Amino acid sequence: MVKILVTGADGFIGSHLVEELVNQGYQVKAFVYYNSFGTWGWLDYLSESTMKYVEIFQGDIRDPHGVKEAMKGVQAVFHLAALIAIPYSYHSPDTYVDTNIKGTLNILQAARELDINRVLVTSTSEVYGTAKYVPIDELHPFQGQSPYSATKIGADRLAESFYRSFSLPVSIVRPFNTYGPRQSARAVIPTIITQLLSGVNEIKLGSLTPTRDFNYVKDTVNGFIEIYKSDRAIGEEINIATQREITIGKLAEELIHQINPAACVVCEEQRLRPVKSEVNRLLGSNKKIKELTNWEPQYTFEQGLAETIEFFKKNMNLYKADRYNI
């Protein structure tokens, strides 16, 4: 049985990826961030029937020795561990360099030394910056509009360099905005939903005019797995996108209509990005992933939102809807 290491397994997308890999018959080694509480993030909420196929490795992606130890005995690595909050990257950019760039280098170097069969490095649509044309394909230029996106550009280019320099069998997976159950309330869809479910009538947001291309998390993780299964994807960088966009304002209107029609949106200054840092439009092309793999999105936006709302209704005790957390 193939064993796959998932870094960032304790996070939002990572925990869903662990779940789906087990469902598809893989053994999983889950790299989770060490903490003194002995908790495994969202993996603590997965079923016992899933977790019996999961081996936990507690460590820190910034430590090359621990990373290499974690990678022993696996055939493939799905590298998702990263710092992703854009506002926090304004606050602590050095930490983003250490985690996102050095952490990725640790994975690539260990994979090279251990002859790992496949490496998937997780990128982000933020590397493109505001769209210069749409739909955004993989040839679109990069623009570091935040310290976060700059570190992800750096990590991507390191991955490319290991493919070109050492023939490391790496693929760069570039999801557009992913949403779904277990997502942090820092993200826009959960922040709207949790505020609405808390009963307040004023929903605090930043800019309402940017557009985003939203992937439901189950489609995102299936994109990862289909890229892994395709040898044609080696050495490639590949978008996961729906080719549909919606403004943040329209998204808020839709969720307000579904949950609390009496609510309204107010713009809160602390939630605004600096003007030159705001990515105003993201609409991705999924032509390449469809050409190189068997991936097709299975969820409509309406279906994904319904499942997401249902999760938050049942788990509001896990969130602090009254606080803005960068």
Predicted features along the sequence, with ranges:
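C-terminal "lid/loop" region of Rossmann-like NAD(P)-dependent oxidoreductases
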Residues: 207, 236-238, 247-253, 260-281, ...
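Hydrophobic "lid"/C-terminal helical patch
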Residues: 17, 192, 221-228, 252-255, ...
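N-terminal Rossmann-like NAD(P)+-binding domain of SDR-like oxidoreductases, especially those catalyzing
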Residues: 1-178, 248, 299, 307, ...
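Conserved C-terminal active-site "lid" loop/helix of NAD(P)H-dependent oxidoreductases
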Residues: 217, 237, 272-296, 307
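Substrate-binding strand-loop-helix patch
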Residues: 181-186, 209-221, 237-257, 298-300, ...
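A short C-terminal helix-loop "cap" of Rossmann-like NAD(P)-dependent dehydrogenase/epimerase domains
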Residues: 48-54, 166-169, 193-204, 230, ...
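Glycine/proline-rich active-site loop of Rossmann-fold NAD(P)-dependent oxidoreductases
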Residues: 153, 178-191, 198-203, 217-218, ...
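Short, hydrophobic alpha-helical segments
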Residues: 228-232, 259, 312-316
